[in-house]
Amino acid sequence: MKTLLLTLVVVTIVCLDLGYTRKCHTKNSPGRETSQACPTGQNICFKKWKKGEIISKGCAVTCPKPKKDETFQCCLKNNCNR
Protein backbone atom coordinates (compact mmCIF):
# COMPACT_ATOMS: atom_id res chain seq x y z
CA MET A 1 0.00 0.00 0.00
CA LYS A 2 2.83 2.41 0.85
CA THR A 3 4.50 1.63 -2.48
CA LEU A 4 1.32 2.44 -4.38
CA LEU A 5 0.89 5.71 -2.48
CA LEU A 6 4.49 6.71 -3.12
CA THR A 7 4.12 5.90 -6.81
CA LEU A 8 0.99 8.05 -7.05
CA VAL A 9 2.76 10.97 -5.35
CA VAL A 10 5.71 10.77 -7.76
CA VAL A 11 3.43 10.57 -10.81
CA THR A 12 1.43 13.56 -9.54
CA ILE A 13 4.56 15.66 -9.06
CA VAL A 14 5.84 14.82 -12.54
CA CYS A 15 2.47 15.53 -14.18
CA LEU A 16 1.82 18.80 -12.34
CA ASP A 17 5.31 20.24 -12.92
CA LEU A 18 5.70 21.93 -9.54
CA GLY A 19 8.23 24.40 -10.97
CA TYR A 20 6.31 27.54 -11.95
CA THR A 21 7.14 29.13 -15.28
CA ARG A 22 6.33 32.77 -16.12
CA LYS A 23 4.86 33.51 -19.56
CA CYS A 24 5.71 36.77 -21.33
CA HIS A 25 5.03 38.30 -24.71
CA THR A 26 8.10 38.30 -26.92
CA LYS A 27 8.84 40.55 -29.87
CA ASN A 28 12.13 40.67 -31.71
CA SER A 29 11.07 42.04 -35.08
CA PRO A 30 8.17 44.18 -36.34
CA GLY A 31 4.87 42.32 -36.47
CA ARG A 32 6.24 39.12 -34.86
CA GLU A 33 4.83 38.89 -31.34
CA THR A 34 4.12 35.68 -29.42
CA SER A 35 3.62 34.50 -25.85
CA GLN A 36 6.22 32.06 -24.57
CA ALA A 37 7.27 30.34 -21.37
CA CYS A 38 10.31 32.04 -19.87
CA PRO A 39 13.50 30.09 -19.17
CA THR A 40 14.09 29.00 -15.57
CA GLY A 41 15.02 31.94 -13.35
CA GLN A 42 13.66 34.60 -15.72
CA ASN A 43 10.53 35.71 -13.86
CA ILE A 44 10.26 39.31 -15.09
CA CYS A 45 8.48 40.39 -18.28
CA PHE A 46 9.75 43.53 -19.99
CA LYS A 47 8.85 45.90 -22.79
CA LYS A 48 11.57 48.05 -24.38
CA TRP A 49 11.04 51.36 -26.18
CA LYS A 50 13.58 53.30 -28.17
CA LYS A 51 12.68 56.83 -29.18
CA GLY A 52 9.01 56.14 -28.37
CA GLU A 53 8.67 52.92 -30.41
CA ILE A 54 8.36 49.44 -28.88
CA ILE A 55 11.31 47.51 -30.23
CA SER A 56 11.35 44.36 -28.10
CA LYS A 57 9.54 42.36 -25.43
CA GLY A 58 10.63 39.34 -23.47
CA CYS A 59 11.74 37.66 -20.24
CA ALA A 60 14.55 38.72 -17.91
CA VAL A 61 16.18 37.84 -14.59
CA THR A 62 16.21 41.52 -13.57
CA CYS A 63 14.71 44.61 -15.16
CA PRO A 64 17.20 45.71 -17.85
CA LYS A 65 18.96 49.04 -17.43
CA PRO A 66 18.15 51.51 -20.21
CA LYS A 67 20.83 52.93 -22.45
CA LYS A 68 20.57 56.29 -24.18
CA ASP A 69 17.12 56.90 -25.74
CA GLU A 70 15.76 53.62 -24.27
CA THR A 71 12.95 53.03 -21.78
CA PHE A 72 11.99 49.75 -20.08
CA GLN A 73 8.76 48.72 -18.39
CA CYS A 74 8.96 45.58 -16.23
CA CYS A 75 6.19 43.56 -14.57
CA LEU A 76 5.67 40.30 -12.68
CA LYS A 77 2.43 38.73 -14.00
CA ASN A 78 1.90 36.37 -16.92
CA ASN A 79 1.78 38.24 -20.25
CA CYS A 80 1.75 41.60 -18.45
CA ASN A 81 4.03 43.14 -21.10
CA ARG A 82 1.35 43.11 -23.80
From Swiss-Prot:
<dbReference type="Pfam" id="PF21947">
    <property type="entry name" value="Toxin_cobra-type"/>
</dbReference>
<dbReference type="GO" id="GO:0005576">
    <property type="term" value="C:extracellular region"/>
</dbReference>
<dbReference type="InterPro" id="IPR045860">
    <property type="entry name" value="Snake_toxin-like_sf"/>
</dbReference>
<keyword id="KW-0629">Postsynaptic neurotoxin</keyword>
<protein>
    <recommendedName>
        <fullName>Mipartoxin-4</fullName>
    </recommendedName>
</protein>
<feature type="disulfide bond">
    <location>
        <begin position="75"/>
        <end position="80"/>
    </location>
</feature>
<feature type="disulfide bond">
    <location>
        <begin position="24"/>
        <end position="45"/>
    </location>
</feature>
<keyword id="KW-0528">Neurotoxin</keyword>
<dbReference type="InterPro" id="IPR054131">
    <property type="entry name" value="Toxin_cobra-type"/>
</dbReference>
<keyword id="KW-1015">Disulfide bond</keyword>
<comment type="similarity">
    <text>Belongs to the three-finger toxin family. Short-chain subfamily.</text>
</comment>
<keyword id="KW-0008">Acetylcholine receptor inhibiting toxin</keyword>
<comment type="function">
    <text>Snake venom neurotoxin that blocks neuromuscular transmission, presenting a postsynaptic action through the nicotinic acetylcholine receptor (nAChR). Has no cytotoxic activity.</text>
</comment>
<dbReference type="GO" id="GO:0099106">
    <property type="term" value="F:ion channel regulator activity"/>
</dbReference>
<keyword id="KW-0800">Toxin</keyword>
<dbReference type="InterPro" id="IPR003571">
    <property type="entry name" value="Snake_3FTx"/>
</dbReference>
<keyword id="KW-0964">Secreted</keyword>
<dbReference type="InterPro" id="IPR018354">
    <property type="entry name" value="Snake_toxin_con_site"/>
</dbReference>
<feature type="disulfide bond">
    <location>
        <begin position="63"/>
        <end position="74"/>
    </location>
</feature>
<keyword id="KW-0872">Ion channel impairing toxin</keyword>
<dbReference type="GO" id="GO:0030550">
    <property type="term" value="F:acetylcholine receptor inhibitor activity"/>
</dbReference>
<feature type="disulfide bond">
    <location>
        <begin position="38"/>
        <end position="59"/>
    </location>
</feature>
<dbReference type="GO" id="GO:0090729">
    <property type="term" value="F:toxin activity"/>
</dbReference>
<feature type="signal peptide">
    <location>
        <begin position="1"/>
        <end position="21"/>
    </location>
</feature>
<keyword id="KW-0732">Signal</keyword>
